[in-house]
Amino acid sequence: VRESIELIQGASEPFSLERFLEGSQTPVFFGSGVNNFGVEDVLNALVNWAPTPQPRDAGKRMVEPDEAKFSGFVFKIQANMDPKHRDRIAFFRVCSGEYQPGMKVFHVREGKEMKIPNALTFMANDRVLMTNAVAGDIIGIYNHGQLHIGDTLTQGEKLQFTGIPNFAPELFRAARSKDPFKAKQLQKGLQELGEEGAIQVFTGEFGNILLGAVGQLQFEIVAQRLADEYKVDALYESTDVSTARWLSFPDDKTKREFEAEQNARLATDVNGNEVYLATSIYNLETTMKHWPQVQFHTTREMNQVF
């Protein structure tokens, strides 16, 4: 053990709280949750070192954590956390103000009010109803499809928190159900998994489904979840797509002309954004040169609509 510690000390840098707080260093802990070894060190470090809530960029302005009015954003959605109830939980970070049970908030993307009757917090498998939450707290909100990753909730102000990017995928598979009678279940499952951010889902003009990922493991996880949670066995086939780019146009005329010429290479993502599916980098570069007025985006903010 002593030799291992000396090796670790020689291969790593001393911990710097200043560098940790500026985001340039990550502490590493060694322990075992099963054996209850080192757990206290992690918890103590969290209490002693974790930064206080910071101001966050909300597009129009910076939101300070000590502001009186409630605001925050959805950063994760998890479906089927309780297999018995097939529920969906939206994980929400409070950025300012205070959550109170039953409060009404303004759903910025939808442009309407919604009520949060019972927010949750989690400890392992246990769920506890929240009596209040302040800036920096994470709450779970039961979600029936009205909340997406990146959604902002406020007390009336039209803000949009940023900082949850979606990257253009590097691997692609065409997906279809082994059982034709379960095509709708496959579509529903992939729609929900796409909204979670578990995988990127693109739909072609004729309803064909294309999955995009940054690593092979994503396909395997999605296949397993479709089988376990949605009872759908799917086929994942190779495709001629090499890379993808989100599109934005300067005007409707350019959009119509581009769509007419490139119709076979277009699809939409779960938020309805138009995507160009290139067969190769050469194909992408050629199209970009031919259409200099069209913007080809390698990233987009979660829930962003171009």
Task: Go through the PLM ranges and name each one.
Residues 1-306:
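Structural and coupling elements of P-loop NTPases
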